[in-house]
């Protein structure tokens, strides 16, 4: 299935039905009085998170979603039927934003999480409501209210614990296929990976974490060069970044230090918060370096790159060093997961784009407004 991580849709809630101005007409009841019923409420549009969906491709082609209008009220105290609600199922990790106001409507982070996108209009009042001691036969009634109409932007940010960074052909896909159940396309040319891949790494019974591989970055990615800039958003939810560097490039004219520096620069240009995330350096393709040269090459790289954080030496192809790296990742995540969740919750709470949702925002489909 094609991976689509962004879409724009229009949601239109149903209009409320009009109230009825009707009088009771019955034999032997000369002054029956008003009996006009209210109009039905318009249908609302909801979104619900579904962990069984992993792409927004359905919304790339179905751009308009309309709920039904409420029926008009009728005589004999007959109220109009409410319009049916519609529910749009979206992948877990979808961020929904109002394109006109910039308002952040929802961040779907849990399976079955439900949010109101567009509220149906209230039904109009029948003339029954306008009866009084001075107006025994009212002719007044009100029309139904229009439903909400919104243009929405949907962005999918995959939920992963660890994100992989690196130039094209740094060995990211080989690494994720080596340590997880993911089976990405692997080849000896750049940009083999065209969409994010997720893999589950298991280090023991009930001990696992999710790792995300995005297309490789190149210099200028933050300005739109290459493919990686389209997918950097998928790293924003991760708790740890692994920066993979090809320590033994096939082209002798390529400097691994310059490439690693360019990646860090692009990360900072795109998002300062992403740049500040915990990041580990992983020197890959160690099997391509003669054993007697490895220590010197690694030391030279670290000195010129001026790196003082965690560093791991691996060969994704042979598996050398991968097991130790995975155990270290799991231990780190287990130690810092609570702090990471707390930081995410704090960021969401501080996001001024979140609206003060009315109580109806959490109502279940079909509840009367």
UniProtKB/Swiss-Prot annotation:
Kindly list the cofactors needed. Mg(2+)
According to the UniProt entry, what is the EC number of this protein?
Answer: 3.6.5.-
Q: What keywords would UniProt list here?
A: Cytoplasm, GTP-binding, Hydrolase, Magnesium, Metal-binding, Nucleotide-binding
Q: What PROSITE patterns is this protein classified in?
A: G_OBG, GTP1_OBG, OBG
A Pfam family: MMR_HSR1
Residues engaged in binding Mg(2+): 173, 193
The record's subcellular locations are: Cytoplasm
Q: Where is this region: Disordered?
A: 128-147
Q: Name one GO molecular function term.
A: GTPase activity
Name the InterPro entries on file: G_OBG, GTP-bd, GTP-bd_Obg/CgtA, GTP1-OBG_CS, GTP1_OBG_dom, GTP1_OBG_dom_sf, OBG_GTPase, P-loop_NTPase
User: One GO biological process from the UniProt record?
Assistant: ribosome biogenesis
Under Gene3D superfamilies, the record lists: GTP1/OBG domain, P-loop containing nucleotide triphosphate hydrolases
- OBG-type G domain location: 160-334
Q: Does the keyword Membrane apply?
A: no
Instruction: Tell me the ranges covered by the Obg domain, including all copies.
Output: 1-159
Record's GO cellular component terms: cytoplasm
Q: Which PANTHER family match?
A: DEVELOPMENTALLY REGULATED GTP-BINDING PROTEIN-RELATED, MITOCHONDRIAL RIBOSOME-ASSOCIATED GTPASE 2
Biological function: An essential GTPase which binds GTP, GDP and possibly (p)ppGpp with moderate affinity, with high nucleotide exchange rates and a fairly low GTP hydrolysis rate. Plays a role in control of the cell cycle, stress response, ribosome biogenesis and in those bacteria that undergo differentiation, in morphogenesis control.
Q: Which family does it belong to?
A: Belongs to the TRAFAC class OBG-HflX-like GTPase superfamily. OBG GTPase family.
Q: Subunit details for this protein?
A: Monomer.
This chain's protein is named: GTPase Obg
């Amino acid at each position: 299935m094609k991976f689509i991580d962004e879409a724009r849709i229009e949601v239109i809630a149903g209009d409320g039905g009009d109230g009825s101005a009707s009088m009771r007409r019955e034999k032997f009841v000369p002054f029956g009085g008003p009996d006009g019923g209210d109009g039905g409420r318009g249908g609302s549009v909801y979104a619900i998170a579904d962990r069984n969906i992993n792409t927004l491709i359905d919304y790339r082609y179905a751009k308009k979603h309309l709920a039904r209008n409420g029926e008009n009220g009728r005589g004999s105290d007959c109220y109009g039927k409410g319009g049916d609600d519609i529910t749009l199922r979206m992948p877990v990790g979808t961020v929904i934003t109002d394109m006109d106001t910039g308002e952040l409507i929802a961040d779907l982070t849990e399976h079955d999480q439900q949010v109101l996108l567009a509220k149906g209009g209230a039904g109009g009042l029948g003339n029954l409501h306008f009866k009084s001691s001075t107006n025994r036969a009212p002719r007044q009634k009100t029309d139904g209210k229009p439903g909400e109409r919104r243009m929405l932007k949907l962005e999918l940010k995959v939920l992963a614990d660890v994100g992989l960074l690196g130039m094209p052909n740094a060995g990211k896909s080989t690494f994720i296929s080596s340590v997880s159940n993911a089976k990405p396309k692997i080849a000896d040319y750049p940009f083999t990976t065209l969409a994010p891949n997720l893999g589950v790494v298991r280090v023991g019974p009930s001990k696992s974490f999710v790792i995300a591989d995005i297309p490789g970055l190149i210099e200028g990615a933050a300005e739109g060069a290459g493919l990686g800039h389209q997918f950097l958003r998928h790293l924003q939810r991760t708790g740890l970044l692994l920066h993979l560097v090809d320590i033994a490039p096939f082209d002798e004219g390529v400097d691994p230090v310059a490439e690693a520096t360019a990646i860090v620069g692009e990360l900072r240009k795109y998002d300062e918060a992403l740049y500040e995330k915990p990041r580990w350096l992983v020197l890959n393709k160690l099997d391509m370096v003669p054993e007697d040269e490895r220590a010197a090459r690694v030391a030279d790289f670290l000195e010129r790159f001026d790196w003082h954080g965690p560093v791991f030496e691996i060969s994704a192809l042979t598996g050398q060093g991968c097991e130790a790296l995975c155990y270290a990742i799991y231990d780190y995540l287990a130690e810092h997961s609570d702090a990471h969740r707390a930081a995410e919750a704090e960021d969401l709470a501080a996001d001024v784009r979140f609206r003060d949702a009315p109580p109806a925002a959490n109502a279940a489909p079909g509840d009367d407004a």
